[in-house]
Design a protein with these regions (language model features):
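Loop/turn elements at helix/coil->beta-strand transitions in domains of secreted/extracellular proteins
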Residues: 38-41, 101-106, 129-134, 177-178, ...
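Surface-exposed patches in mature extracellular/periplasmic domains of secreted proteins
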Residues: 83-94, 136-139, 176-185
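Bacterial N-terminal signal peptides
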Residues: 5-17
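Aromatic-Pro/Gly-enriched surface loop or interdomain linker
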Residues: 19-105, 109-112, 234-235, 241-269
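Short alpha-beta junction capping motif
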Residues: 42, 105-157, 163
Length: 269
């Protein structure tokens, strides 16, 4: 208990300290990847996106928040653990790149804009079956108006239409896959920080509760969690904007706790 309390204090202190840094977001720029060196490197997955998946400033759907969100999360990881993760160097890797299999954990966002190719489906299947852990974030049901769909998206397209697009794509990856709604009793919410309630997780959008779903090996909740899904929220937005003062520190703390737990779980399972 004392260790967890100390870590919570360290997390709050670290989040407060991040306020001195500038925030996002100018034109999109993709940075060179670093070679694998055995040190933990956060990996973001690149993918083929459908119509409407290119946003303001040339940001592709897969790239929102890159690399600042994960850089801030890695600063927190190094504050509360001895992981010694790379902080400034964030790798953005295509599913078709064999280098992906050197990394046990990968992060992907805005998956309802994903126009999954056959090669991407096959690569993701192999990655998961070989033990890779995938964190999915930042997508929601389609809504009308300013916050609905993508900026300049095609209203006649299924892309940007929330869960149904992603679920259909995952049936191409693992045809028997069944996502299970998770509650706070799941081990992933207790691997480092004790997250006893999910109804306090901040909402990055404009309505509804965040929904947490998991994909388990053989669809058995007693087996390995292969994919963790944050639906109807954008946890990484709190990491990304934590240096701006635009998000409450308490909410940002909860988002960082999730990120830390996800990484610890992925690295130990």
């Amino acid at each position: 208990m004392r260790v967890l309390t100390a870590c919570s204090v360290a997390l709050l202190t670290a989040v407060t300290a991040l306020a001195q840094f500038g925030g996002p977001r100018g034109p999109f720029h993709e940075y060179p990847n670093i070679p694998y060196d055995g040190q933990f490197t956060f990996v973001r997955l690149k993918y083929t996106h459908g119509p409407g998946g290119n946003w303001y400033g040339g940001w592709p759907a897969w790239g929102h928040g890159y690399p600042l969100a994960e850089q801030n999360l890695m600063k927190i990881m190094n504050e509360v653990s001895f992981m010694n993760a790379h902080v400034d160097e964030i790798n953005a890797i295509s599913l078709e790149d064999p280098a992906l299999f050197r990394y046990p954990l990968a992060y992907i966002i805005e998956v309802d804009w994903w126009a999954m190719t056959d090669r991407e489906a096959a690569a993701l299947r192999e990655y998961i079956q070989k033990g890779g852990f995938v964190i999915v974030d930042d997508f929601k049901p389609r809504r009308r108006g300013r916050f609905g769909g993508g900026f300049g998206g095609d209203e006649g397209s299924d892309y940007g239409n929330g869960w149904s697009v992603f679920e259909a794509a995952m049936k191409r990856v693992l045809p028997e896959s069944k996502f299970i709604d998770l509650d706070a009793s799941q081990p992933i919410f207790h691997t480092f920080f004790e997250i006893d309630r999910l109804d306090i997780i901040p909402q990055a959008y404009i309505q509804g509760q965040p929904i947490f779903r998991g994909l388990f090996e053989d669809n058995d909740p007693k087996k390995r969690l292969q994919m963790m899904v944050n639906y109807n929220t954008d946890v990484s937005q709190f990491w990304e904007w934590s240096g701006t003062g635009l998000r409450a520190i308490d909410d940002t703390n909860e988002a960082y706790k999730l990120g830390v737990n996800y990484i610890i779980y992925g690295m130990t399972h």
